[in-house]
Amino acid sequence: MSEFWHKLGCCVVEKPQPKKRRRRIDRTMIGEPMNFVHLTHIGSGEMGAGDGLAMTGAVQEQMRSKGNRDRPWSNSRGL
């Protein structure tokens, strides 16, 4: 049985990760928002401490009904 593990061990070699550096992003690379669609506004008085969770569900449902989720610029996943 040890021969089996020896043969298996020599075939399975961990590949080194490529040394790819990610480009750093600075503020000059970021432009103005494009295709922005304002769906709703939540004021400070609308999200009280007692009803915050219940209100959140209502706002999320309103936002779902407003927009088309198939837009290419939308990267939200399901509010």
From Swiss-Prot:
A lipid is attached at residues 10-11 (S-palmitoyl cysteine). InterPro entries: CRIB_dom, CRIB_dom_sf, SPEC. Coiled coil: none annotated. Residues 63-72 have a biased composition (Basic and acidic residues). The keyword Cytoplasm applies. The keyword Cytoplasm applies. Keywords: Cell membrane, Cell shape, Cytoplasm, Cytoskeleton, Lipoprotein, Membrane, Palmitate, Phagocytosis. GO terms for cellular component: cytoplasm; cytoskeleton; plasma membrane. It is found in: Cytoplasm, Cytoskeleton; Cell membrane. One of its GO terms (molecular function) is small GTPase binding. Its main location: cytoplasm. Residues 48-79 are annotated as: Disordered. It is a lipid-anchor. Residues 30-43 form the CRIB domain. One of its GO terms (biological process) is phagocytosis. Interacts with CDC42 (in GTP-bound form). Interacts weakly with RAC1 and not at all with RHOA. The CRIB domain mediates interaction with CDC42. Belongs to the CDC42SE/SPEC family. This is CDC42 small effector protein 1. It comes from Pongo abelii (Sumatran orangutan).
